[in-house]
Amino acid sequence: MLKKVFLKTFKLDKFSQLLYRENSYNCIERFIERETSNYTISIQTNILLEKFQKYISQLSNADLAFLLIHSGLIPEHYKPDSSEETFYSKLCEDLIREWSVRIGFTKSYLPTMKSSTEDVTILNDRNELIVCDGKAFRLGRSQAAPNVKDMLKEGDISKWLHPHTSLYTTIGGMVVFPSTHDWKSSTDFYQYTSNKKQPILALNYEHLSYMLIKGITSDFIINSLKNYHEIFPEQLRKKDSKIKNRDKYYENFENFENYFFGDDLEFWNLFKEFSSIVINEKCFDTASKLTTRIDSVKASIIQNFLCTRQISQNPYPIRILPS
């Protein structure tokens, strides 16, 4: 249960009511269902995206912050590689774009060419550019040890930055992913993302939410990437790490210039506790809906089986009259 003191602290008081939380948990799924049902043929992604951008632009910072906390979790009942799954992933990417605009990257956009490009192009008025890879996964997918290549291929960020170098000041990269699919031990991923030769910020959706709530601006992201050599003077190699390089990564990042925490480490720890409760409730909501769907399908199968058996046992079979 969400403690009201958490909600008051983060100015999310309305979410003390379950109805508002459930609306947020199901926000993207219901949006897709509502918009796709209005078309007799498949809706194009760009049309759906336009509608979604208009919708989320009207959300308050509090609504967007709460939505970000539990983002990146694809509904389990979507078929693999289905249009619904594609839509959901794309709309999660657009949440990142909307977040970046609100903290000061006012020229951010989603590239129209998907192949071999970043998911979100993050850009400010000074033409400083960051390429971002936004991730969304199913809860049922392996969480304890995700495949590193599914998260980020080494060299991708450099490849995506290259086409922008002639027009913009390229700063580095970002990867945003749900904390439910983070590693529990050292991994090549945090070795890649701690390489000062190619700065790459690895952030959970909760980090984005926290920045929005605390009023942390785009300058923090820019300064972090520009001073990556100070945050990670040495690469956090998987085999050399005395502690988990995942833990060391966030210890270094979150303590950089004491800017992320500010003077209030307690606030950040409270927010992480709050976020964990929100995500657990979201997971429970997902599991409950999946169970309901399974029970419904099971009941339908049983009903069809009984009807079939009743027909096969009919003592008065249908006779075909001679022609």
Predicted regions and their residues:
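Active-site loop/lid in soluble adenylation, ligation, and acyl-transfer enzymes
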Residues: L2, D182-W183, S209
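Conserved alpha-helical elements of sugar-nucleotide-dependent glycosyltransferases
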Residues: Y88-C92
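Catalytic cores of nucleic-acid endonucleases
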Residues: A136-S194, A202
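Short, well-ordered loop/turn elements at secondary-structure boundaries
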Residues: S115-E118, R126, L167-T170, K196-K197
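Active-site beta-strand-loop-beta-strand hairpin of nuclease catalytic cores
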Residues: I122-D133
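A short acidic/basic microdomain associated with nuclease active sites
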Residues: E93, R97-V120
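Charged, structured surface patches that assemble and position nucleic-acid processing machinery
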Residues: F189-S300
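Interdomain/boundary linker segments immediately adjacent to catalytic/signaling cores
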Residues: L2-F87, F274-S323
